[in-house]
């Protein structure tokens, strides 16, 4: 959404690490932490600790374990895209992107223009977030004509993806053969994905409206918005 004005966006970070050897250098401890700050998100700390122990007379048996956290900030596209692809509008979900995206769209002749007050209407990204229905509920309404099936969307702004990771491993060289065994366990939160919503060009979106007509006569004035939001699992 940089057609009218540039997108000012900044990130910065800092990293430090400490290494200490113990037990006649058989045990190696490494601890590190990284701090990252992005304009649209709270700062993130990413700590990591690891231990490596070398056993045996020749120290050929190496056992290791580590714990760390990490994150991935949403890309600039996740946050600031605003692109009409015809069948949908791809919309990034940075808070200020909702007002950056603006477009004028035609309204159907007859009921639509009478309700909207003209042949066109101006939309912004705020419509997708604050005045839209879930695509699944609109599909159910389309199939049955039952407005009680319509569900208003409840969207959260995109957040950084997060991961917590544990790793255990063993490595050695035994009788001319290299042995390397690793195990991982990761827990992810806040996966980023697309979520389709359907926004009326006029009228107020609400759960189970008594009259379906405000969402657009014969679906002529419904628009699909493909929104970047947190994927719910």
What are the residue ranges of the model-derived segments?
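Structural signature of outer-membrane beta-barrel domains
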Residues: 1, 11, 36-40, 68-74, ...
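Flexible, surface-exposed loop regions and adjacent strand-edge segments
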Residues: 2-10, 46-50, 80-87, 196-205
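Surface-exposed extracellular loop regions of Gram-negative outer-membrane beta-barrel proteins
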Residues: 5-52
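Outer membrane beta-barrel strand-and-loop segments of large Gram-negative receptors
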Residues: 7, 15, 147-161, 165, ...
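Structural signature of outer-membrane beta-barrel channels/translocons
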Residues: 19-23, 52-56, 161, 171-175
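Outer-envelope beta-barrel architecture signal
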Residues: 25-29, 45, 59-63, 175-179
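Transmembrane beta-barrel strands of outer-membrane/channel proteins
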Residues: 31-35, 51, 65-69, 78, ...
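Outer-membrane beta-barrel translocator/channel fold
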Residues: 56-158, 162
């Amino acid at each position: 959404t940089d057609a009218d004005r540039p997108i000012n966006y900044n990130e910065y970070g800092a990293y430090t690490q400490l290494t200490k050897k113990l037990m006649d250098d058989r045990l190696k401890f490494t601890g590190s932490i990284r701090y990252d700050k992005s304009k649209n998100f709270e700062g993130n700390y990413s700590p990591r600790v690891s231990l490596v122990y070398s056993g045996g007379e020749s120290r050929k048996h190496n056992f290791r374990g580590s714990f760390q956290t990490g994150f991935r900030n949403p890309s600039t596209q996740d946050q600031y895209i605003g692109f009409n692809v015809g069948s949908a509008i791809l919309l990034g979900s940075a808070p200020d992107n909702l007002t950056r995206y603006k477009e004028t769209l035609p309204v159907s002749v007859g009921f639509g223009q009478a309700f909207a007050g003209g042949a066109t209407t101006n939309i912004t990204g705020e419509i997708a977030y604050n005045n839209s229905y879930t695509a699944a509920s609109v599909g159910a309404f389309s199939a049955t004509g039952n407005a009680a099936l319509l569900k208003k969307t409840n969207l959260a702004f995109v957040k950084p993806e997060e991961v917590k990771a544990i790793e255990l491993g063993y490595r050695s060289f035994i009788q001319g053969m290299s042995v390397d065994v690793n195990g991982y366990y990761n827990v992810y939160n806040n996966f980023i994905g697309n979520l389709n919503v359907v926004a009326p060009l006029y009228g107020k979106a609400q759960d189970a409206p008594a009259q379906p007509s405000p969402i657009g006569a014969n679906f002529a004035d419904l628009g699909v918005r493909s929104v970047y939001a947190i994927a719910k699992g």
